[in-house]
């Protein structure tokens, strides 16, 4: 129970009921009165609109120029085939854009398991039917583009793609979210003598590309990250103090003596008024070889010493020398 009337009850995860691999029910309690709807509605909206995932975005079918057509030997029209392709549940690792291929011939259903893909791709629903071939000589060949995204993106919003795409490349409305259904319910909860508390029950179904528990965890993380700005609200009114980055790397401001060159090389550089490492790196090999008494052996020594410090001759330094050196 609370130690003070101003303290809020901290909810705990009471139960996770795994109805199936894609269907789960999560129960959270106790919540202060009203917080069940506050949190439940926020999580529901995020789960429906903001979960990242992979979806079919473009399809090329051999012999098909546009979606308002049909293909000989295929029972479904092209619009229905595209609609079925939207139902593919795909998981892609380490890539944001992949091309899958499908080639099938002979009578029978064409299913997701007939799609050819590499090791970075996993099709979660291999039994998903894409179309049916109705003739022994019928065949279908297609290339399916799968991209990573978030939420729902209609094909009509990708206008730049429509203008650039070749004839025969069909755009598909992309539903990236792996969440298929989400509902929440707020029930009464009790802690000791308090009976006005909430219990939040979230029921969630996904397409299998993401486990229900992980989906809720990600949604809660997104919500928490968005609310972080309000936690630091007082700091927003204060001007942000930007750390001034040094204009030049500190090593460039050090004297040439720090390179510990031989006496001959050091004296030649001083005679040319090269006092700082920043002065030296801006000189080219040709310029240094014109220096009296500085030969190829000394030049090689200078290049090796600079290279050991990640520097080289012929570098360009904007705004050199800095004010601190110019004043000396």
Curated annotation (Swiss-Prot):
* Reactions that this protein is recorded to catalyse: RNA(n) + a ribonucleoside 5'-triphosphate = RNA(n+1) + diphosphate
This protein's GO cellular component annotations are: cytoplasm; DNA-directed RNA polymerase complex
Question: What job does the chain carry out?
Answer: DNA-dependent RNA polymerase catalyzes the transcription of DNA into RNA using the four ribonucleoside triphosphates as substrates.
Looking up NCBIfam families in the UniProt record yields: PRK05182.1-2 (NF003513), PRK05182.2-5 (NF003519), rpoA (TIGR02027)
Q: Where is this region: Alpha N-terminal domain (alpha-NTD)?
A: 1-234
The record's listing under Pfam families reads: RNA_pol_A_bac, RNA_pol_A_CTD, RNA_pol_L
Q: Which domain of life is it from?
A: Bacteria
Report the family membership.
Answer: Belongs to the RNA polymerase alpha chain family.
Enzyme Commission code: 2.7.7.6
SMART domains linked = RPOLD
Q: Which UniProt keywords apply?
A: DNA-directed RNA polymerase, Nucleotidyltransferase, Transcription, Transferase
Q: Which GO terms describe its molecular function?
A: DNA binding; DNA-directed RNA polymerase activity; protein dimerization activity
Broad class of enzyme this protein falls into: transferase
Q: Which HAMAP family match?
A: RNApol_bact_RpoA
GO terms for biological process, alphabetical: DNA-templated transcription
Q: SUPFAM superfamilies given for it?
A: C-terminal domain of RNA polymerase alpha subunit, Insert subdomain of RNA polymerase alpha subunit, RBP11-like subunits of RNA polymerase
Q: What is known of its domains?
A: The N-terminal domain is essential for RNAP assembly and basal transcription, whereas the C-terminal domain is involved in interaction with transcriptional regulators and with upstream promoter elements.
- Species this chain originates from: Haemophilus influenzae (strain ATCC 51907 / DSM 11121 / KW20 / Rd)
Quaternary structure annotation from Swiss-Prot or TrEMBL: Homodimer. The RNAP catalytic core consists of 2 alpha, 1 beta, 1 beta' and 1 omega subunit. When a sigma factor is associated with the core the holoenzyme is formed, which can initiate transcription.
Annotated segments matching region Alpha C-terminal domain (alpha-CTD) = 248-328
Tell me the protein's name: DNA-directed RNA polymerase subunit alpha
